[in-house]
From Swiss-Prot:
InterPro entries named among the record's database cross-references: AGPR_AS (IPR023013), AGPR_type-1 (IPR000706), NAD(P)-bd_dom_sf (IPR036291), NAGSA_dehydrogenase (IPR050085), Semialdehyde_DH_NAD-bd (IPR000534)
Signal peptide (UniProt feature, chain positions): none
Species, as recorded: Pseudomonas savastanoi pv. phaseolicola (strain 1448A / Race 6)
Protein task: Catalyzes the NADPH-dependent reduction of N-acetyl-5-glutamyl phosphate to yield N-acetyl-L-glutamate 5-semialdehyde.
Entry-linked Gene3D superfamilies: Dihydrodipicolinate Reductase, domain 2, NAD(P)-binding Rossmann-like Domain
Pathway participation: Amino-acid biosynthesis; L-arginine biosynthesis; N(2)-acetyl-L-ornithine from L-glutamate: step 3/4
Keyword field: Amino-acid biosynthesis, Arginine biosynthesis, Cytoplasm, NADP, Oxidoreductase
Main location: cytoplasm
Protein name: N-acetyl-gamma-glutamyl-phosphate reductase
Main enzyme class: oxidoreductase
Subcellular location(s) per record: Cytoplasm
Protein family: Belongs to the NAGSA dehydrogenase family. Type 1 subfamily.
Active site positions: 150
Length: 344
């Protein structure tokens, strides 16, 4: 049984980790921390978890207690894992970080986008980017895993087959992405209030979003060189979900795009390439650790459209984190993640 600790258990990704791990056959949450809620039983804050964590309460983060775990998940704002990850790694504990702290390999670039110096640049050489569909072998031997963001997960999985095959014009990629309001986190903000977000639909961060350098970093690796990406995120009035509509120019019209995508993801348990002509819906992946993809070539032209949907809290965060844990500890990759999407 893998002994699990969670730092930051009161946000959406924290409670989603608890929900998924409650049904995991080979993992047990033994520590969960929150400075603001220390002493409160988990089941009191989250009644949906009654009967699963009745003996577990939030505690103040303590390196000694966390260091006794096999793995510690950080479901925290950026900067927190910088301060604690090194001590946990020194104690022999594996670290899986859901924040952005170790996603970017360039600490200067990280500081530019997050507005503060990188707090642990010496650990970047140990950090493995936790996109299993790309880095599965590296994940198996990792000490520190950086779980990809939600937009980067949906966008990279949609573009990868085209870039790896070398058939797209890498200089003019477009990612037109929509997210539900849970992507903004559980903290109070005016933009995510019901009266502000409901019955409205808006773009934001067009000048530059923090996920842009992460997406670009991954796509460069796939393409084997520089890429040009325009990334425009939008907020839509739903709770969960990412819908990425991706555009790339593929001049060679003889390429069987459906076959290309099906072959690339044939052995991936959590990527579903839909039949030709399909339009995946976010509700089909709600609560599931699945990226559902469809590829189109409208009017037979040279512009290819890829539709990619995920649940931002599952495959875009906590589910992918558990998937990484399963790989890291040699477990069945599907363990605890077999939930079908919730419909309606």
């Amino acid at each position: 049984m893998v002994k699990v600790g969670i730092v930051g258990g009161t946000g959406y990704t924290g409670v989603e980790l608890l929900r998924l791990l409650a049904q995991h056959p080979q993992a047990e949450v033994v520590v969960i921390t929150s400075r603001s809620e220390a002493g409160m039983p988990v089941a009191e804050m989250y009644p949906n978890l009654r009967g699963h964590y009745d003996g577990l309460a939030f505690s103040v983060p303590d390196v000694k207690t966390l260091g006794a775990c096999d793995v510690v998940f950080f479901a925290t704002p950026h900067g927190v894992a910088h301060a604690l990850a090194g001590e946990l790694l020194a104690a022999g504990t594996k670290v899986i970080d859901l924040s952005a702290d170790f996603r970017l390999q360039d600490p200067v670039e990280w500081a530019k986008w997050y507005g503060q110096p990188h707090g642990a640049p010496q650990l970047l050489q140990d950090a493995v980017y936790g996109l299993p569909e790309v880095n599965r072998e590296q994940i198996k031997n990792a000490r520190l895993i950086a779980v990809p963001g939600c937009y980067p997960t949906a966008t990279q999985l949609g573009f990868l087959p085209l870039l790896e095959a070398g058939i797209a014009d890498n200089t003019r990629l477009i990612a037109d992405c929509k997210s539900g309001v849970s992507g903004a986190g559980r903290g109070l903000s005016i933009g995510s209030l019901y009266s502000e977000a409901n019955e409205s639909f808006k773009a934001y961060a067009v000048k530059g979003h923090r996920h842009l350098p992460e997406i670009t970093q991954g796509l460069r690796r796939a393409a084997g060189g520089d890429i040009g990406l325009t990334f425009v995120p939008h907020l839509v009035p739903m709770i969960r979900g990412i819908h990425s509509t991706l555009y790339a120019t593929v001049a060679d019209r003889s390429v069987d795009l459906q076959a290309l995508f099906e072959k690339r993801y044939a052995d991936e348990p959590f990527v579903d390439v839909m039949p030709a002509g399909s339009h995946p819906e976010t509700r089909s992946v709600r609560g599931a650790n699945v990226c559902r993809i469809a590829v189109h070539r409208p009017q037979g032209g040279d512009l290819v459209v890829v539709l990619s949907v995920i649940d931002n809290l599952v495959k875009g965060a906590s589910g992918q984190a558990v998937q990484n844990m399963n790989i890291l500890f040699g477990l069945d990759e599907r363990a605890g993640l077999s939930h079908a999407g919730m419909m309606p």
